[in-house]
Amino acid sequence: KWGWPSVTLPLLVWFLFHNRNIHKAYNATWWRLLKLAYRLRRNGNQIQIGSSYRAHLAMAAKLLEIPPETEGVVVECGCFKGGSTANLSVICDFVGRDLIVYDSFEGLPEEDPKDRYAGASARGHFRGELEQVKANIERYGVIERCSFRKGWFSDTLPQHVEPIALSFLDVDFQASIHDCLVNLWPHLIEKGYLFTDDYTHLDLCAVFYSEEFWQREFNQKPPGLIGAGSGIALGQFWVGPFISIGGNPAYPIQTPA
C-alpha cells in the first residue's frame, strides 16, 4: 500500500545517504539502502517503539562512514519492547557489527528526588520483558547480532570493556544518563558516535555542555550536542549556563531563558 511516507521515504534515503564519506566496502547501493529504510519503517509500525526509524537511519548513515576494519560494537541503553533494538540489529547486520543491549527489563528505576522526571509514578514505566524483546527481534530483526546484559545501569555498565563505534541512549533519567556517560564514553572509539533519544529532556541535554562534569570525569571540554540543546531557544528553556539540583554537580540543569 502506497501512501505519503512511501513517497517521501526515497527522498529521506537520498538526503541521509548521499554522502561521499560512506565506505565503499559496504556496497551500500541505492536499492539496498531503500530496502533497509522500508524495513526499519515497517518495524516501527509492528513493534511498540519509543524512537523514530528516521533516527535509526541517521545512525546507519554514520556507521556506514566508519571503515569496516575499525573495531567497535554498537551499544543500546534502554530498549523498551525491542523496536529500536530490532532496527539496530538490522543495521548492525548491514555493517557487520555486533549489538550489545543494556536494560533492566523491569522498566524505569526508583524515584530520584534530584530529578524532576524521576517521580514515584514513573517507576516501572517502559518495561519490556527480556523474552518479549527477544521474540520481537527474532521476528523483525537479526537476533544473532545481539547480546543482552540485564540489570540496572549502575551495576552492568561498569563491566563494559568493548570498544564502541556507536552508542544509543534512551534512558529518561539523569542518574541513568550519568551512568551511561561515565562508563561508556571512555570506550567510544575516535570518531565514534553517541546518539540520545532524550533530547526533549533538556535537563539531560545539559550534561553535554557541563564544563564541570566533563573536566571532572574525563579531563576534557564538553562535546556539546548536535540538535536539541545546541543553543537554540526551545520553548521556555535553553541549555546553559548551568546550575545544580541540590548542590550535586552530577545533575546540571538548564536556566530559564
What does each model-found stretch correspond to?
Residues 55-56, 129:
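Activation loop
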Residues 1-55, 67-70:
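Rossmann-like AdoMet
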